[in-house]
Amino acid sequence: MERIQVIDNIRQLGLTTLPVGSSLFLYGSQARGDAHKGSDWDLLILLDKPVLTGQDYGIGYPFRCLGWDIDEEINPQVYSQKEWSDYSYTPFYKNVEQDKIVLL
């Protein structure tokens, strides 16, 4: 599947499954443009709440299912907006913030 089609599928799934106020970003090699055939798709999902609850951890599952359906590896990471901002001192946070592409 073409890159733009994968991005469109991810975006459409986000529109139909994520709670209002959520943000969805693509990061990593797919966002930087240096991905190769077989590279995974790294997603950051931020929920508009201070802390995640047990239910929130399942929010990424539909994205994994999409990946299985289209034969791509999709790896969603889910955080609350507050929890994500608390990681601002980490190299992971800095790399994601540098590379990310807004999908929603």
Placement of each model-derived feature along the sequence:
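Catalytic core of pol beta-like nucleotidyltransferases
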Residues: M1-F25, A31-K37, L47-L104
